[in-house]
Each structure stands twice: as C-alpha cells, then as structure tokens.
Amino acid sequence: MTSNLKYKRVLLKVSGEALMGDKQFGHDYDTIKKIAGDIKELIDSGVEVAIVVGGGNIYRGINAALVGMDRASADYIGMLATVINALTLQNVMESLNIYTRVLSAIPMMSVCEPYIRRRAKRHMEKGRVVIFAGGTGNPFCTTDSAAVLRAIEMNCDVLLKATQVDGVYDSDPKKNPNAKKYFTINYKDVITNNLQVMDLAAIAVARENKLPIRVFSIKEQGNIAKVVQDQGEYTTIEE
C-alpha cells in the first residue's frame, strides 16, 4: 500500500491550543485521544509520521515578553511547555498501541531522548512515531520554524500544519465572514501579503528547501489522513 501513497513520510505540526479542546488552558484528553486516533489512521495506511508540538496551551513566550519578562527566558519556559505536551501526547498514543519516542532539542535525559538527527530517522525507519519537543532549542524561534527544520532534516515529503481553520485565508475568517480562502498559494505570496499562517522565517526556509505545506483544520475527525490523500478541505503552500 505504501508504494501508492503520494506522501510516504510526513511531519505533523500540532499547536498547543489544539490539545486544549474547548478549554481555556491545559489538556482536554478526549480531544487528544481523537487526534491520536487520527494519527493512528495515517500510520495504518503506511505513512511514516513525525510530530512537532507547540506549547501555547500552557505558556506563550512572546506574550510573557510583552509584559516585561526577558524574551529569551520566556522562550525557554515555552520550550519546556512543549515537552509537557509531547509527553502527554506520547502517553495517549501509546494507549492506542502506537510506538512513540519523544526527542527534545533541550537535553533532559531522565525524561526523554535528546534530539539526534540520525537517531530520529532510525526511529522512523523502524515504524515509530517521533515527537519533537523543545522547539529548535533556541530562543526567538517559533515551533513553526522547528517544524520546518525537522521536516527538512527528516526528509519528509510534506509538512502538515494542523490549525483551527480549514486553510489559509486573506484575513481572519473568524473576524471577517467575507475572508477569501486560498486553495493553493505560493511561498512568495504568503510572505508578500504577510499572511498569518505561520511565521515568515519558517515560510522562507520552506521555500528555500522546496518543502510543501498543507494547512488544514484539526477539528474535523479523520482530516489528517484525508489531507494526505488529497481529500477534504486544506490549502497547499508551494512554489
């Protein structure tokens, strides 16, 4: 079945907010279990999966910096939040018998494995899901940038960005009911129009390395596998 797949290895970017469900903070385990089930559906189809998780459901470094906290310190706290999310997602996925490894860009040997590129690729070759935590390990970098970098390092065919809306719009569809949706858009237009789908540094790196990005809503159950199979609602960002 794998030979018929358009994308054989993917990286899924899951925001911290996606793990909250309808809560205002923390984790909603029913929501996380649904996400894990969607990931399992993708794995069962023969796709190798890596994941980058955000930390915004627990801590947002850029917001803390706005109220006076040192930005670098705030970003490091945010990186720790991504480790909490990665371990939470790992435990839920393992309850569904999905073999999973957490690798952190910030070494914490008692908690998870350190990020080593060759080790991560070997895990994926063995059929394990790799969850990357700790962002890039550097302050002033978003988890979107981490997702693009890890996707390139893992030789992924596509980056799947799971969001709260079903694609890229010319303005916020939650605020503007007349917002126009793009079904395909190139990297240059995302940058030129300053579309807020992900930070512009991440888009620039994706463009330089010809990494396609698919943006879709994680709220619809089964959507991850649909997007990989060219079904459902999504926007593709490519050259």
Swiss-Prot record:
GO terms for molecular function: ATP binding; UMP kinase activity. Catalyzes the reversible phosphorylation of UMP to UDP. UMP binds at residues 55, 75, 136-143. Pathway: Pyrimidine metabolism; CTP biosynthesis via de novo pathway; UDP from UMP (UMPK route): step 1/1. Homohexamer. GO terms for cellular component: cytosol. The gene is pyrH. Keywords: ATP-binding, Cytoplasm, Kinase, Nucleotide-binding, Pyrimidine biosynthesis, Transferase. It comes from Rickettsia bellii (strain OSU 85-389). This is Uridylate kinase. The lineage of its organism: Bacteria, Pseudomonadati, Pseudomonadota, Alphaproteobacteria, Rickettsiales. PANTHER family: URIDYLATE KINASE (PTHR42833), URIDYLATE KINASE PUMPKIN, CHLOROPLASTIC (PTHR42833:SF4). It is found in: Cytoplasm. The keyword Transferase applies.
